[in-house]
Design a protein with these regions (language model features):
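Conserved alpha-helix/loop element of class I SAM-dependent methyltransferases that forms part
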Residues: 33-52
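Conserved SAM/SAH-binding beta-strand->alpha-helix loop
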Residues: 81-83
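Conserved SAM-binding loop
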Residues: 88-89
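Conserved SAM-binding loop of SAM-dependent methyltransferases across substrates and taxa
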Residues: 61-72
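Conserved SAM-binding strand-loop segment of SAM-dependent methyltransferases
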Residues: 97-111
Length: 173
């Protein structure tokens, strides 16, 4: 298990949903990045249809999962690492109303899209925040194509990528 994931799980176990207290008592930039409510600013302005479901590609310590769960009927968190998914599970363990709306899937987006196509599963929102994991342009294009395939007919793809200027981060993500 990655050290940061172990540390975050320990914080969630100790502080539950009191992330502000966890941050006050544990001053580390990596904790701030993972736990700060400010990260929700990236999507806070979006007017979501509460009847829709979202697919969040990349667990990202659950930084945006809570906002999606509060605003939508359900959220599926897709990540290639079971360890990353466990961090999100622990984050919402003490918030049963949100935890009940979150589903976890350990897979890559391309495999998940192929499986979803067979069973007809699509989402009103697909959220891809900085999780383009392929090293080359063709691989990233394949990931975006797979994300698009997971959208319902009138669905919305929300994407924000890390960049040299840190604009994503200045926006709160």
């Amino acid at each position: 298990m990655k050290k940061i994931n172990q540390e975050l799980i320990a914080l969630f176990d100790k502080y539950g949903s009191d992330r502000r207290r966890a941050l006050r008592e544990n001053k580390k930039l990596s904790y701030l990045y993972a736990l700060a409510d400010l990260r929700e600013n990236l999507l806070d302005w979006c007017q979501f249809d509460p009847e829709q479901q979202a697919l969040q590609i990349g667990a990202d310590a659950g930084a945006l999962t809570g906002l999606l769960a509060r605003r939508l009927s359900s959220v599926t968190v897709l990540d290639v690492s079971e360890e990353n998914l466990e961090v999100v599970r622990r984050r919402f363990k003490t918030e049963p109303e949100l935890a009940a709306k979150i589903r976890y899937v350990c897979a890559d987006v391309e495999t998940y899209a192929r499986e979803a196509e067979k069973r007809g599963g699509t989402y009103g929102y697909v959220v891809l925040i900085g999780d383009l994991t392929a090293a080359d342009r063709a691989g990233r294009a394949a990931q975006m194509t797979a994300a698009k395939q997971l959208l319902s007919a009138h669905g919305t793809l929300i994407a924000a990528a890390s960049n040299w200027f840190g604009v994503k981060y200045m926006a709160g993500a």
